[in-house]
Amino acid sequence: MGARKRLRAEKLKSEKNLTALASLNSSPIAPRKMRLVADLVRGVEVNKALNILQHNSKFASKSLEKLLRSAIANWEQKNEGKSIEDEKLVVSSIQVDSAAMMKRIQTAPQGRAHRVRKRSNHVTIIIDGAK
């Protein structure tokens, strides 16, 4: 491996250590409802985001809080000996994607039936040091 390629690889590896990722798959909450809560904490410092999620009354905030705690634990595992407060971690991105839908039938008048789509979502959260 050449010198430039090695330096580039080392730089990418050090940048990768500064970020942490956590994902939640097939959460049984509609993506639209989850996005309402995700928009509150996107781009916010980690401690402030945890505070926002703890005091939010929406059901989706509980699962997002758990996911954020998991991302923090992943970051601590990568960066042993470093403190969250010193690094000023920020929720750099949250992606809420729709997952598989469960299709159910609800009875309707005159012998008909309507389809009910129970939606679920995938959430990916990335935390990063403030720049």
Where do the PLM segments sit?
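Structured, basic alpha/beta domains of bacterial-type, RNA-associated proteins
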Residues: G2-N25, L36, L40, E45-K131
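Conserved residues at beta->alpha junctions
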Residues: P28
